[in-house]
Amino acid sequence: VLNTVGPFFKFGLPILEASIESGCHYLDICDDWEPTEEMLKLDSQAKDAEITVIIGLGASPGITNLMGLIAMEELDSVDTVITGWDLSSVNPAEESSQTGTNAAMIHGIQQMTGKVKIFEDGRLGMVQSLKGIKINYPGKGIYKANIFGHPEAISFPHHFPKIKNAMNVAHGSKAIDIYIIK
């Protein structure tokens, strides 16, 4: 099964459960932290069914995880992993090419409203979505960013238990203001 059906907070877990029950290998591009947390708990069931399950094979998560892993392998120690996107060049379209609501829109609204889960000070916890933080980027200075709910905050500490902090952010000059729902 190659699952690209979103939003994943609605469809991810039941499709994975059906794949395991059917004995089918499973790949997806899950980009929601809520099902990621539950999907990771199905590891032993997938192993018992002798199937391969790989979740989060998109750009983010996916490529972001690989980039984080490569960076971690180059360092002596890592206590914080922050993935994110630079939105400084984002401009709202004059007219949308979309004729209706799509999974990406629903995903974005879900992850920018309410609370989201991050890994902070060695434990998972809920924080307000779009909470402002400052990131000290070595050799570049301090950047302002906003927390955006995403699976990397769950998957990095799951696979690398020595990490103390993991989160996903959106940053960029004024671009984040486009996405703040007031």
Where would I find each of the regions flagged by the language model?
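Rossmann-fold NAD(P)-binding glycine/threonine-rich loop
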Residues: 12, 29-53
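ADP-ribose/adenylate-binding Rossmann-like module
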Residues: 7, 16-36
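Hydrophobic beta-strand scaffold residues
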Residues: 1, 25-26, 53
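Structural motif
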Residues: 3-4, 29, 56, 84
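Rossmann-like NAD(P)-binding element
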Residues: 1-12
